[in-house]
């Protein structure tokens, strides 16, 4: 089901879904991002709580990588990834110490080709993140932090990514 939803959200690689747990998925995601990116200070906090079986797909990982990569581009010295549970949802928050979002960028969040990077094809990362999250019944919120920097929060209902219960 998750693969089908992700395929319809724009994932066309057709890679198989993997059965895992939320904690294992986000721990592996954080470790892979850390090991494949040059980042002086990457803070990772996994406060998800009691683990939950889930189905993961490369699109879920790429969705978070897009946000982390944007944060690294804006704040090459410091990025934080925090994972928590909000009632029946997985909440993934990426924080940076960069200049924050321009007001017009926040107003047009989710519109394709909105980017501060001024390069061809830019501005699709957050657009794809929003589409995948919405397809799964989730949400994406972005804001500028009062102390500086930006924060992007992805919230996905656990029901959309949970493993179906085994039938007795």
Model-derived segments and their meaning:
Residues 1-45:
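Conserved DHp (HisKA) dimerization/phosphotransfer helix of two-component histidine kinases, i.e.
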Residues 62-73:
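Conserved polar catalytic motif of the HATPase_c/GHKL fold
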Residues 96:
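Acidic ATP/Mg2+-coordinating residue in the GHKL
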Residues 89, 100, 123, 145-153, ...:
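Glycine-rich nucleotide-binding loop
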Residues 101-113, 167:
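Short conserved segment of the HATPase_c
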Residues 78-88:
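Short beta-strand/loop element within the Bergerat-fold HATPase_c
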């Amino acid at each position: 089901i998750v693969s089908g939803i992700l395929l319809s959200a724009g994932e066309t690689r057709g890679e198989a879904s993997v059965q895992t747990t939320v904690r294992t998925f986000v721990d592996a995601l954080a470790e892979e991002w850390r090991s494949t990116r040059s980042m002086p200070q990457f803070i990772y906090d996994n406060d998800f709580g009691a683990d939950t079986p889930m189905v993961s797909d490369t699109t879920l990982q790429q969705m978070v990588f897009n946000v982390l990569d944007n944060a690294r581009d804006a704040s090459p010295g410091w990025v934080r990834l925090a994972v928590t549970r909000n009632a029946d949802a997985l909440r993934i928050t990426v924080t940076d110490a960069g200049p924050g979002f321009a007001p017009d960028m926040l107003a047009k969040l989710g519109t394709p080709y909105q980017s501060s990077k001024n390069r061809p094809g830019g501005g699709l990362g957050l657009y794809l993140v929003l589409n995948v999250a919405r397809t799964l019944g989730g949400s994406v919120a972005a804001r500028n932090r009062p102390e500086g920097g930006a924060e992007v929060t992805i919230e996905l209902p656990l029901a959309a990514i949970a493993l179906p219960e085994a039938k007795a």
